[in-house]
Amino acid sequence: MGEVAGGRRGSVQHYPLQAIGHHTLHRVHSTHDNNDWLEEAFPQRVFINPVDAAPRNIRDGDQVRVYNERGTLILPCRLTERIMPGVIDIPQGAWYNPDRNGTDRGGCVNVLTSHRWTPFAFATAQHTIMVQVEKAKAP
């Protein structure tokens, strides 16, 4: 008990939310992430169910810190019931943009993934990312 695919024993207690990454409208994988017009139309953000946001005192539009033992990123959030409780969604393809502390500010979901390959695709496990989310502290 307490072990998740691609994770370690105890991951669920420390990282209770599952992160997934969908293909977004404004990028083809990572192509076009530097297009300011598309970023304005489709800003990079994490989607969170209000059920998960409420106990964390997170409101729509807040900057949030998404993290696990592999990495950390900070980006704005969008509260929506379109994401089931217990799951967050970060659109894939954002470019890695670390600050001076190594925290990604670009919203690159890859900073949270394992380097272990999946047995079927021989690629990273994009849908077994266990994370925690909290309201980001002001810089």
Predicted ranges, named:
Residues 1-36:
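Long, low-complexity segments enriched in small/aliphatic residues
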Residues 30-47, 51-139:
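Long, contiguous, secondary-structure-rich segments that constitute the structural scaffold
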